[in-house]
């Protein structure tokens, strides 16, 4: 890996990103309300020509600003003749993940070396939370990429001695605000502001400069908000206040993703699977020393550590802490809110893994062997299901039929492509056993772990997941409805009693409405 130049590593990373993400975006139909709720907004834009505040789902306004929906509409118009599909609706998220991964590589490669940056990029690409978000039609991955990109640009501005205007950072913050509201500007400015203070920059200088960049970044969003208010009036203004200020101050008229304070710790731990398993295992291989609890001494050591910390390390550490604490404040908590800290965690995790290799820690081989066993067990379970060795009668309870449908879907997987993808992690798992026996521990083992992880994702994304999730899809119901009430007959009406009493965020048949081309009222 030492002979790999930055340019070659970049193109290698790009190819791997494209090959492991893009081919599988359209295989799964919509199976939750979240994705079609966003994609139908883009459908309405293309259908009605209203790119400011289109109405959908029976007259409902979008709950988020339009940049993400513009992206879907633009992609759909460019590659699919203006037709919004599962694939085109997920493409902006995939592009955002790929772009963020590549930019992260370039950022750290320039400052910390190609080898460390490449491993950090692979870890970013293969943790569960980002991998899932990069294949979803939701605003969060695009917001994450814009936020992280703005942070990188503002750090580059810091390296230049705070001289000039960071136009790219301002543009990215503008797009972030147009994706999910003021948080797209607040987060980058808050993180960089605290970082500058820790680096000894005068408070008023940092505050005034970042305030100026924040104001500039809000010009484009302000234009949209004015145009949207002219269309939506007080109804739009009330929605904006609820979704932004109400969510942050815990004064929403309805409960939205309300979770306890420890929720963020749990979701961060789960979101970094499978790498969290490696970290947990490594804790048993470290050498620990006795220490005494002396608050004054610890605080002095901590402040000295911060003062002497490498600028890139401090910037990454500040990003993690500030964003994490920021999203602990509101009652509304979701795992995806924390995604902007994932690339910075990947950087520290990559450093830690190289440290483990340097110490010749056996945990690297142990973890790789666990992944190999999982790969082999996954294939074994597939063969067992394919042979019909598990009776459907073992499933009982309310979700019995869903589980039976999942099992039948896995049993019905066929086709050379799907079977080839299923075989990949199995082959890699077998190869791992020979590789780790014949070779002494070195840095190449870390990239072998990445390959094992990617092999599992290929099988899941290309074969297992589409089969299982499509068994939950209601697309076939929409097809049957079309036979009875074709599109030529016009609008259809839905009735959901729960929506009549909902304080906010009413329930709709989002999936059916998308597959029926926004005909439900």
Each predicted region: which residue ranges?
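Membrane-integral, polyisoprenol-dependent glycosyltransferases
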Residues: 1-365
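Membrane-embedded architecture of ER/inner-membrane glycosylation machinery
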Residues: 2, 167, 288-521
